[in-house]
A protein has these predicted regions:
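Conserved MFS/SLC helix-loop-helix module at the cytosolic interface between two early adjacent transmembrane helices
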Residues: 64-100
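Cytoplasmic membrane-interface "Motif A"-like loop-to-helix N-cap segments
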Residues: 74-85, 282-296
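Cytoplasmic helix-loop-helix junction between adjacent transmembrane helices
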Residues: 108-144
């Protein structure tokens, strides 16, 4: 225990976390359509139905990418995958800066989604930093991503207020392209300077990646409870996506004000909340800390459902947005920390991250299309349908976390499960 407490972040580790955070921000180009829904829709002259279709098709592509991305990240070096991914992001961001319209948006966002990034990046960090620092590493990863994203968001807010949606989307995409280029260089330095002692030790045949071990992973209850619990918490992004147009349409906020709020929720909170989330998870445990963020999710949705949808109540609506965004930013570092907490085998770590990401994005494959059509058909009632479904989803997340909490107290983590399966074999 004393050795764990003495573990400290080195300059090299801080550099690795910052570069990966910058890269995470650069991949935000594929999230423009979610995080800056209003201005992207206007810049490309799209309808809510078309936006929903793009989001759904992109989500299907993401599910496919997460499936093969995690597996190849446990077979191919993270550096190789990340080099290809960042070069692709750089080129695609430049193309997206031309505001290409509906059909081209589908193609570009699908290409974004099909390019693996998250799983190899997490694997790179996992093999260059000690596991006892995982909470701190992933918390600061999100924070650095928020800091660099804040710069992008503020520049976009200025562009919206000064020049309108078309120019602001162009500015955003160019900045993402530049960040991709910088990260591409940084990844080469990290891979070159990584110390041998931080890399995994030589593994026996039973400890290497294999489809037999992968089959054990997908049968492990602890893994599924993490994957599903994180997925139900992640569904808050669906509600958060539609809160921005809701604020403009029903609460009387200007487009520039909503863009500024989007910047705060996407970037300012991303810089602050994950640091607290990592500290809180280290203090009381990752599983127990997740109750707080699921509670924020539920409180946010209850507020928005019970207040009158008029301009007089816009402050309550803004508070609801910030509360839900805080829930999502607090949940984010836990998605990886929980996998460490349940002692996921390192030879399957990227595969587990991939399965978690794949399960997490399955609702996106149909939810955005359904939500967009519901809003177009029912207006205000359509928005409320979205939030009512969100209540059911967050309750499901609480159930998963309660069961996981009980299993962890009984010592039934992934290492225990793999040992049991090994004895049976």
């Amino acid at each position: 225990m004393s050795e764990t407490k003495k573990a400290k972040m080195t300059t090299f580790m801080w550099f690795a976390v910052f570069i990966c955070g910058l890269g995470s921000t650069a991949t935000g180009a594929q999230s423009i359509i979610k995080n800056f829904y209003v201005i992207y829709k206007e810049a490309n002259m799209l309808t809510d139905g078309q936006m929903g279709t793009i989001l759904s098709i992109m989500s299907i592509a993401q599910v496919l990418s997460y499936f093969y991305g995690g597996i190849i990240s446990d077979i191919i070096k993270p550096k190789t995958i990340l080099t290809f991914a960042l070069a692709s992001y750089c080129v695609s961001s430049i193309i997206l800066a031309s505001n290409p319209g509906y059909v081209a948006s589908i193609v570009i966002f699908c290409l974004f989604a099909l390019t693996p990034f998250w799983a190899p990046m997490v694997k790179l960090l996992a093999t260059t930093t000690p596991p006892e620092l995982s909470g701190k590493v992933y918390g600061w990863l999100d924070s650095f991503s928020g800091l660099t994203g804040l710069f992008v968001g503020l520049a976009t807010t200025w562009a919206v207020a000064s020049f309108g949606s078309v120019f602001s989307v162009r500015v955003m995409c160019i900045m993402y392209a530049v960040m991709s280029g910088i990260t591409l260089i940084g990844i080469q330095i990290i891979a070159k300077q990584a110390k041998p002692e931080t890399a995994p030790a030589e593994e026996s045949e039973d400890e290497k990646f294999s489809f037999k071990n992968m089959l054990k992973l997908v049968k492990d209850p602890a893994q599924w409870l993490v994957w599903l619990g994180i997925t139900f918490g992640y569904t808050g992004y669906i509600g958060l996506t539609y809160m921005s147009p809701m604020l403009v349409e029903f609460f009387g906020m200007s487009q520039a004000s909503v863009t500024l709020l989007d910047t705060v929720r996407n970037n300012v909170l991303t810089f602050i909340i994950p640091i607290f989330s990592g500290w809180y998870a280290d203090k009381i445990g990752a599983v127990k800390s997740y109750y707080l963020w699921l509670g924020f999710y539920m409180a946010s949705i209850l507020i928005i459902l019970f207040i009158p949808w008029t301009p007089a109540y816009y402050l309550f609506a803004v508070a609801s947005v910030l509360l839900l965004a805080s829930s999502l930013k607090g949940r984010s570092p836990l998605s990886n920390t929980l996998l460490t907490t349940v002692r996921t085998p390192m030879m399957l770590f990227s595969t587990s991250v991939a399965f978690e990401s794949m399960v997490m994005t399955i609702p996106d494959t149909f939810a955005y299309s359904m939500a967009g059509n519901a809003i177009e058909k029912y207006g205000m009632t359509g928005y409320k349908y979205i939030f009512i479904v969100s209540i059911a989803l967050v309750l499901a997340g609480l159930v998963c976390n309660i069961i996981l909490d009980r299993r962890m107290k009984a010592g039934k983590d992934s290492t225990w499960y793999f040992a049991q399966k090994g004895e049976q074999a």
